[in-house]
């Protein structure tokens, strides 16, 4: 009887003791027009779907991508709350944003020094592994 009772308790507690299952989520944001030098422009929030937003899941890797017209460049950051990662190019992968998988991400863009022509950023995407 004691063994049976112990197994019953283990089966009830197991979901709480087991680590969160790995997974991924992806999101896209609408285009952003970056027009005024020195001003930061923010993408819309990139939100996880409900099932990926389970508490206890933490980001392992983030892949990002955005597009600009040929020959145009921007300063860009990928952010989770106030914590921002400077991006070295319009696509890449990083393990630096290892915060909660349920927290939204966003991009920030800025025209480089001396640039006066507006740039429209398209194809704004993330793929989050948790």
Regions found by a protein language model. Give the residues of each.
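N-terminal secretory signal peptides that target proteins for export/translocation
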Residues: 1-2
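Bacterial N-terminal signal peptides
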Residues: 5-15
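Disulfide-rich extracellular domains of secreted proteins
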Residues: 19-130
């Amino acid at each position: 009887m004691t063994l049976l009772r112990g197994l019953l308790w283990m089966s009830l507690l197991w979901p709480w003791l087991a680590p969160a299952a790995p997974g991924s989520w992806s999101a896209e944001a609408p285009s952003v027009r970056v027009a005024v030098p020195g001003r930061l422009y923010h993408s819309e929030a990139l939100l996880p779907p409900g099932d990926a937003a389970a508490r206890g899941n933490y980001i392992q890797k983030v892949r990002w991508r955005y597009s600009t017209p040929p020959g145009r460049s921007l300063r860009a950051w990928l952010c989770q709350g106030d914590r921002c990662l400077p991006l070295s190019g319009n696509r890449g992968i990083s393990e630096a944003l290892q915060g909660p998988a349920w927290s939204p991400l966003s991009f920030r863009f800025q025209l480089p020094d001396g640039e006066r022509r507006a740039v429209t950023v398209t194809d704004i995407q993330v793929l989050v592994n948790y």
